[in-house]
Structures are given as C-alpha cells and as structure tokens.
Amino acid sequence: MMPTKPLAEADPQIAQLIREETRRQAEGLELIASENFVSPAVMEAMGSTLTNKYAEGYPGKRYYGGCEVVDKVEQLAIDRAKQLFGAEHANVQPHSGSQANMAAYFALATPGDTVLAMSLNFGGHLTHGSPVNFSGKLFKIVPYGLKQSDETIDMDEVARLAREHRPKVLMVGASAYPRTLHFDRFAGIAREVGAALVVDMAHIAGLVAAGLHPNPVPHAEIVTTTTHKTLRGPRGGLILTREAHAKVLNSQIFPGIQGGPLEHVIAAKAVAFHEALQPSFKEYQRRIVENAQALAEGLKEAGLRLVSGGTDNHLMLVDLRPKKLTGKIGEEALGKAGITVNKNMIPWDPEKPMTTSGIRVGTPALTTRGMGPGEMATVASLIGRVLDAPADEKVIAAVRGEVRELCAQFPMYQDRL
C-alpha cells in the first residue's frame, strides 16, 4: 500500500531539515551568483506525479507506453525554450549544465580532439577543460585567459591560439566573468580556423532571454545552459542548436549519456520558460543588472577591489588581497553574519582553489526578493564592515542582526517556514 502520511509525520528529520534550510534562505542574504529562488509554481511542478513516469526517448518516439501526457509536457518545454532564445531546436532533457556540455562536446568532437576554452583559473568552468573533469581527461585542452591590463578576455590570444592549435571546438562561456561576452568575435575566429563554436551561457541565460546580453544562438553551432541561475528555473540543463545538428545532439543525450528524462523537472523548466516569456521577466533582469552595478559601486566605496573594475552582468569578483584576507576567510566571516557568498579564484590567484584570494558575489536572488539599489548600498556596507573585522564577534553579531531586519522587509516562502 502507498504510504499516505505527510512528510512531517513520515520523516520528521527530513521535514525539519527542509524547514531549517527554508529559514536559512529567508533570513539570510543570498549573494551566490549561481543561486536564485524559484517560484511556487516551479516547485509545484517539480513535486508533481510526473516524477513517477519513465519516458526514455523523445516526444512521439518513446521506449515506454503511457507517455501521451509527458509528450505534451516535454513538447511545451521545447517550444517555449525555442521561442525564448530564438533557436531552431531545443533539447530539454539534460539533467545539468555539465551533462549538456558533455553532449555538446560529443556531438562535435571525439576524444583526443583539441578544444580551446577559457581557463578555470581565469573564470572558466570545470567542464571547460579542467584536468580533474571529464573534459580535461578526454580532450586536448588549450586554455585562454585574460589581459593583465584590464582583466578582460584577451581576444588577441584567443585568435593566436586558435590559429596555432586549430581546435575542433572553441568553447566560450564562464562561471566567474563579470564582463560582456562578444560572441560575434568568437564566431569569426572559429570560422577562420574551421572550429565549431559552443557557447555555455549558463550564468547569463536570463540576461540573454531579456535582451540585456548578446544572444549566442545566431553565432554558435551549439548553445548550452543551466535552467537555474539567472533563468530562475529548476536545477537542470538545456541545449539549443540548429536543426542540422538536432539528430546527432539528441542521440548524445539519449541514449548517449542519459537514460530516462526527469519529466517532473522538465515540467518545471516549461513553467520557468513561460515565466521568462512574460514582460515582467525583462524588468526583473533589468533590475538584476541595475542592482549589480549598485552593489559594485557600494563595494568599491567600502574599499574593496573588483576584478576588471566592475560588472556588466549579474556578478562581480572581489579581490581580498588588499585586505590581507583569503576567500575562505571572507566566505566564512560573511556566512556567520548571514551573508552567503562563495570563495572564488581570481585571475593569477596565488592561492589554492579551496583557499582562493577572492569571493564571487551576485544579485539574482536578492533581486527576486524585491530588493533594489538602495538595499544594495546597504548590503555593500554590511559586507565591508564584516571584511574589515572578520574576527570581531561583536561586529559579526551586529551585522547579523541588521541582515535579519533587512530580510524581514522582503519576506519569502513564509508558508513554508
């Protein structure tokens, strides 16, 4: 028989931990650039009976019966993703951005081929060729980086390395780069050397959808993204491509690297895409950028150095070396004060990845809560106070109290506490 007890009775320990996490999110300042708060509608879709259904294959071509409803769900997600980004084809089945990237590589290259990608040390992602990741183990990775003069991507170096190494794939994208990515310039380099252009827009997908960042879809053979972060959907992946690549790309997801798709998550993706197609989403993205610029100015006024001097998107990197702090110390001190950030490598970082010399800060989650430039000035001041006295328990406690007061003005998930 089916267990019918609600979660609080069926598993009080998990129920309590969920309440604790919800309270942590509601009472703290979430500044991790890759995190956001999904809508109740997205969560409702993820918790639906769609989680029960196996559906190997694609709409209309399944290996299981009973897929007539999930076919409609998945097709809605596909159609909405295509409309949102102006793409010819969309695959909504990737369980994550990493799996989306894996499928993109396998669709365009074979193990041992050369891939030109942004170095993790300069803001790239693990799946862009880190030696500890599948991408670095299966492919010959040639990394590119930044100019020391302004800490922006060295496009001359990208062109030089492309001509020298003739990569099969030119991967563009970053997990910690605060400036605009000029996809047209990358596309020109890729064409010159006969490389396929792949763009990982995981961090900036929401900005792209709102027209606040250049769209890579017209320039790239394949575009990958997560569906959370600025897109504000469930945790998952998405691939966009041209119709000419659709068949081979689909086969790399299933049966290549995945089995059954998560139709409850795909439904949540569809809901998020629907939300992103509304005019209010464009205004939300505009506010993300406005808040990021206000936060950046506030951090500079607090005496903090920002990599590249500021931001064009939703995130910024703070160099803590002038404060004689590591990223690890900064993250821990801010965490005690109720401000969540992540330690992050900065360009030419002398520290190890688990220590780092910087922190990464972003505004998507606080913008979802309704905070604006005025609150960003306050947040910047709070961050500055903590980083000026990271070991002072009185300062930490005082800031923690102010954080709670600020968060109380922008309540969230109250029915779940």
Curated annotation (Swiss-Prot):
N6-(pyridoxal phosphate)lysine sites (modified residues): K229
Annotated site residue numbers, Plays an important role in substrate specificity: H228
Cofactors, names only: pyridoxal 5'-phosphate
EC assignment: 2.1.2.1
Gene Ontology biological process terms from the UniProt entry: glycine biosynthetic process from serine; tetrahydrofolate interconversion
Pathway membership, UniProt: One-carbon metabolism; tetrahydrofolate interconversion; Amino-acid biosynthesis; glycine biosynthesis; glycine from L-serine: step 1/1
Residue runs in coiled coils: none
Positions of (6S)-5,6,7,8-tetrahydrofolate binding: L120, G124, H125, L126
Keyword Amino-acid biosynthesis: yes
MF-aspect GO terms: glycine hydroxymethyltransferase activity; pyridoxal phosphate binding
Catalytic function, reaction form: (6R)-5,10-methylene-5,6,7,8-tetrahydrofolate + glycine + H2O = (6S)-5,6,7,8-tetrahydrofolate + L-serine
Record-linked Pfam families: SHMT
Cellular compartments annotated: Cytoplasm
Keyword terms, alphabetized: Amino-acid biosynthesis, Cytoplasm, One-carbon metabolism, Pyridoxal phosphate, Transferase
GO CC annotation terms, alphabetical: cytosol
Family: Belongs to the SHMT family.
Subunit structure, as described in the record: Homodimer.
Matches recorded under HAMAP family: SHMT (MF_00051)
Role according to the record: Catalyzes the reversible interconversion of serine and glycine with tetrahydrofolate (THF) serving as the one-carbon carrier. This reaction serves as the major source of one-carbon groups required for the biosynthesis of purines, thymidylate, methionine, and other important biomolecules. Also exhibits THF-independent aldolase activity toward beta-hydroxyamino acids, producing glycine and aldehydes, via a retro-aldol mechanism.
NCBIfam families referenced in this protein's UniProt entry, alphabetically: PRK00011.1
Name under which the protein is recorded: Serine hydroxymethyltransferase
Native organism: Anaeromyxobacter sp. (strain Fw109-5)
